[in-house]
Swiss-Prot record:
Low complexity bias spans: 499-511, 594-613
Organism: Mus musculus
Organism classification: Eukaryota, Metazoa, Chordata, Craniata, Vertebrata
Region (Required for interaction with ASXL1/2/3): 57-68
Molecular function per GO: chromatin binding
InterPro entries tied to this protein: Methyl_CpG_DNA-bd
Role of this protein: Non-catalytic component of the polycomb repressive deubiquitinase (PR-DUB) complex, a complex that specifically mediates deubiquitination of histone H2A monoubiquitinated at 'Lys-120' (H2AK119ub1). Important for stability of PR-DUB components and stimulating its ubiquitinase activity. As part of the PR-DUB complex, associates with chromatin enriched in histone marks H3K4me1, H3K4me3, and H3K27Ac, but not in H3K27me3. The PR-DUB complex is an epigenetic regulator of gene expression, including genes involved in cell growth and survivability.
Keywords for this protein: Chromosome, Nucleus, Ubl conjugation pathway
Miscellaneous remark of the record: Named 'methyl-CpG-binding domain protein' for homology to other methyl-CpG-binding domain proteins and the presence of an MBD domain, MBD5 and MBD6 may have evolutionarily lost the ability to bind methylated DNA and are recruited to heterochromatin by alternative signals.
Protein's name in the database: Methyl-CpG-binding domain protein 5
Gene name per UniProt: Mbd5
Amino acid sequence: MNGGKECDGGDKEGGLAAIQVPVGWQRRVDHNGVLYISPSGSLLSCLDQVKTYLLTDGTCKCGLECPLILPKVFNFDPGAAVKQRTAEDVKADDDVTKLCIHKRKIIAVATLHQSMEAPHPSLVLTSPGGGTNATPVVPSRAATPRSVRNKSHEGITNSVMPECKNPFKLMTGSSNAMGRLYMQDLPGSQQQELHPVYPRQRLGSSEHGQKSPFRGSHGGLPSPASSGSQIYGDGSISPRTDPLGSPDVFTRNNPGFHGAPNSSPIHLNRTPLSPPSVMLHGSPVQSSCAMAGRTNIPLSPTLTTKSPVMKKPMCNFSTNMEIPRAMFHHKPPQGPPPPPPPSCALQKKPLTSEKDPLGILDPIPSKPVNQNPIIINPTSFHSNVHSQVPVMNVSMPPAVVPLPSNLPLPTVKPGHMNHGSHVQRIQHSASTSLSPSPVTSPVHMMGTGIGRIEASPQRSRSSSTSSDHGNFMMPPVGPQATCSGIKVPPRSPRSTIGSPRPSMPSSPSTKSDGHHQYKDIPNPLIAGMSNVLNTPSSAAFPTAPAGNGSVKSQPGLLGMPLNQILNQHNAASFPASSLLSAAAKAQLANQNKLAGNNSSSSNNSGAVASSGNTEGHSTLNTMFPPTANMLLPTGEGQSGRAALRDKLMSQQKDSLRKRKQPPTTVLSLLRQSQMDSSAAPKPGPDLLRKHGQGSFPISSMSQLLQSMSCQSSHLSSNSTPGCGGSNTALPCSANQLHFPDPNMNSTVLQNSLTQSIPLRGEAVHCHNANTNFVHSNSPVPNHHLAGLINQIQASGNCGMLSQSGMALGNSLHPNPPQSRISTSSTPVIPNSIVSSYNQTSSEAGGSSLPSSIAIAGSNHPAITKTTSVLQDGVIVTTAAGNPLQSQLPIGSDFPFVGQEHALHFPSNSTANNHLPHPLNPSLLSSLPISLPVNQQHLLNQNLLNILQPSAGEGDISSINNSLNNHQLTHLQSLLNSNQMFPPNQQPQQHLLQGHQNLQAFQGQPTVPCPANNNPMACLFQNFQVRMQGDAALLNKRISTQPGLTTLPENPNLALPHFQDTPCELQPRIDLGQPMKDGLVMGGQGDASVDAIYKAVVDAASKGMQVVITTAVNSTTQISPIPALSAMSAFTASIGDPLNLSSAVSAVIHGRNMGGVDHDGRLRNARGARLPKNIDHGKNSSEGDGFECFKSASCHTSRKQWDGEQSPRGERNRWKYEEFLDHPGHIHSSPCHERPNNVSTLPFLAGEQHPILLPPRNCQGDKILEENFRYNNYKRTMMSFKERLESTVERCTHINGNRPRQSRGFGELLGTAKQDLVLEGQSPGSSNSLESSLVKDYIHYNGDFNAKTINGCVPSPSDAKSISSEDDLRNPDSPSSHELIHYRPRTFNVGDLVWGQIKGLTSWPGKFIREDDVHNSCQQSPEEGKVEPEKLKTLTEGLEAYSRVRKRSRKSGKLNNHLEAAIHEAMSELDKMSGTVHQIPQGDRQMRPPKPKRRKISR
């Protein structure tokens, strides 16, 4: 604080006689009054500002004397005499400059910025439109910046000083006028003056510009000026170009951004400027402008996004930071900004906060510009604000870079602001989307800023709130969304703006992890940020820039690198040299990555964002959501969505990277593979995804948080994460309960989006609440997350659902990221896209999704697949809409995809009765085929599966999606373009044939459908029901009706009709019959559970938090479980497995329910087997088909399946499947391409169905289960470590003995999961589940099927956790690792895996031995056979399980530790479900020794 000599700092002499200017400080007198310039460049125009500045953490207070007497040191009387500065004073000033980190940072940033100046021109070029929009904002911006600056100075000066440098510098250098602005003491007058003054400032900027490295005449502002020049009235487009053109300008631009952007942000944040409100309300461009003010380039979304300018703003992390601040301004919590003060970044942060992260906001306007349409589109002001904020964020980074503000931003964690902010955003979405967790400081900066803002209208939050989206920001819901949007926007902007994206890496989704990363590892963050963020940035650049010409340069530009440098600097207070070196490195990395991403992503904005930003943009996407949401309709929205999805992915990646988990790599690979496999399709879907992601807001903070967490923790989706086109709807899922679907789309979605930035994606989002698609689906097409998550992670989100169907983002995407995944308008997309989306959000689903989306395009309305990841992480997929009949033609090409959709459709069919018929057949046909395709996505899609169960067919669809996701990477383009619809088409051809029968049967299946749907429906019904209302019920019914219908009924009843149908189905897809049979075998009630379980497992695999809440039908379970992780939720579900079964039974009316489940299972089995067969391209008789399936999973499994099939009654069922397999064979090659993963997944799919089917008939189930168990066992041996099918099986198991049958299903799922795991979850759970462990696991689960331990599906994290736990458990056992991995990855029938489900302690994992599963059903049908009616309670189920287990389990079968783990898991399950699984004491006693082992393992 005493930067110079104490006497220098505040010469006591400098009393009334002569004012002594503190060392390192400058005092300027002009017509506006006295202006004090802090060493960091903050401009303080009044005592209040000085106080605020000094009280703001992170502001530069160097050179001030210790006992600081403000009136003595700071004299704002223009006539006061100033003590002449002596040479000594000058030297002291120099010393202060050397000693002052803030100053050094500013200089370093300026230097860095200048070094990166070149790209700026292109950036400037990018936002021609921005200028216009900005123009209206200019005045307000000018005014606001000044006010903001004043405020900033007051509150943020200290903290901002460094960062303030940006704003102040802007004021000083970029806009001395701004300083003057600040000088205008009155906030109101300042603001008013700001209007006139800002331009002056800008004009005067040259004068002050000298002060800071950024002094480029109004370059700083001009940068915003390009979009801000009009805004500021400073120059015009030319200034913008000019500033952009010249490094100085850009440098100044940054300051300008800080200043102008600040004002803009302020403006954004405060209503003071009418333009801001205009901007917000007025036009996207305007909003852009406001943001642009922050970042000149942000002015135009494209510019911001695409041009270096944008990048610059991005660099202006300070701005970014400011945005968070601004957002945080909304949030009084900004108090924390002071904490950030330690780092310059923090200082800047406060400044930004003080300045109103408008600097960030400015970039957001840039973003808004990018998303002009959306901004405009969104009457929802917040949307605009969001856009602005994101833009600001994006733009900000560049601005920040030049200014010290940049440095603080990092501290603020501009990235984290986005990042943590995202998290916090999610957390505080209500407060301020931007209140980043990381920005806690930023928020607190903002708080300070708020104080400041509140203190002075200049950055008055209210004004911002009222004007920008401050109002929205203020209001937690809509405003919050706005706020969130703003927060998100920073992310989004980054996403939007390739360059900002880098800073955005800390976008909400990424932010969660990234935020932490930033927070935790500023340096690494910078490095990582430069990698991850840069990647995102590059991705973002590609994505953000609609005309991504300069995107490439942007990343290098320092937008990202600088951001990272700033982050690094801020976080670590690195010396300028360190900062510069970091920035240079980041820039290089960014450029390299960007180049790669650009080429990779192809310029397609959406595609780029999707592919390029796969890693980085996830975060961006999340950030982008609000904007994207708004933009959704617009092309920019595309970028936003893509960015959102990418952001979710990035966020997931960040979190993964943070964890250093292979999954990230796997996801990246997957994503890449998907991108590669469907490079062309990807753009569209990605764009859609991005849109979806953008719209993938999570309405509620909790949702957002969940989405974020889902996506961040579970790569997936966007959703979410994750965060797809359905993102808007995502809230529907999660927020669905809270908001109407449609509303959700616009407001809730935006809110959610902002909040979830996710991806909840996230990613997704991610978990991507956003996935819950608005049924209208303009956003839906824009995919959420995803996710990616995926997805949301997720996700979505997410982002996860390219169609927005898979917002898991997201993902998981997310998504979550999921989180809420909802595919809404695209029938095709629902399954393929959802799966695809999931993949994108969590893996690389983008490519698949794109096709899906494309396909969905024609009939997507037909299928409204709502895959929602509930807050608890449950992913509910509901399909509502019309059959994809028109799509059927494509279906013929890729029946399984179409069928997938059909499956989804069934849900939709539920909504539309006529839909179900086409859907059902399609589903049945497509599911089998789709499974192989989606198997990789199985994990992702498992979420869908969870949701799909609601649709009855959803199970298969989910599985298909999951399976499809992986294979979709290969098949997605075909699948999406052809298969998605093909399912319908082919199904219609064949399935319809069968379907006619089916339809005839449909009426009956309708009741059964609930059985299938019931568990699922129950789990997701609440969400879905809210989202789709009676559609959900219809889904259940239709689910049953569609493909499932015939099978779902009693094996006899269902089979007869279905057999008829199957025959016809077979023609459509040979698999039809087998599938039918399999479904029948699969078990009526189990299908739903299996679907849920699968979905949960998928979500878990994705790393999404999956909480299955049995809602509608299994209402009882839903209550306790929602908070639980997927596993716990599933456990609850399982806890109510009986409940589920019961519900299913009730819904199905006894056997009917079973039939439905059976149908679903059969479908699943079909889908799985068909895919497997397709994968293998082997047509085989029943055994053969199985073999094919197995070969898909693994050869051994194949044989096992065959052998098992033969032994079991399953054989017949499988026969039908084999028929399906034949058609599947056709599709086999795509799946086959991925022998390990895809093949496994296809196998898994096949298995899943068997598992699902077995529950149908106890004995048959037993046979099936045995087969499955055997297959699983062998498969395990075959190294199907990710035995999600096991999880699915467990899910199936939830329904009593069926679980055993489910085991088969679970195996199918497991295979897919395994594949996914292999790709995405290798780290914790490597392919280590051995056959023995798996067998034990399965066996145990089989015995324990009633317990519905299966019900608990671990999230990917759960799986990882389990795997790790399992590994720990069996550390001594060589196969322990394998087994463990396998266990978590692929849970067998009875296997309840409490992996690291979010919020749940990882269970060792309950294992059902294959023997148990097999024997329980096979040996003692009476005992093992648990009918839905029988399994009325978890306790009952547990008891039945224990009985079966005792009988069927061979003492040696289960490892002791396995037994113990199972026992423990059961206990935990009971605890969680609140039910006591009454396991016979004998069982428990038997298990005790194992616990020791497990403990040891642990």
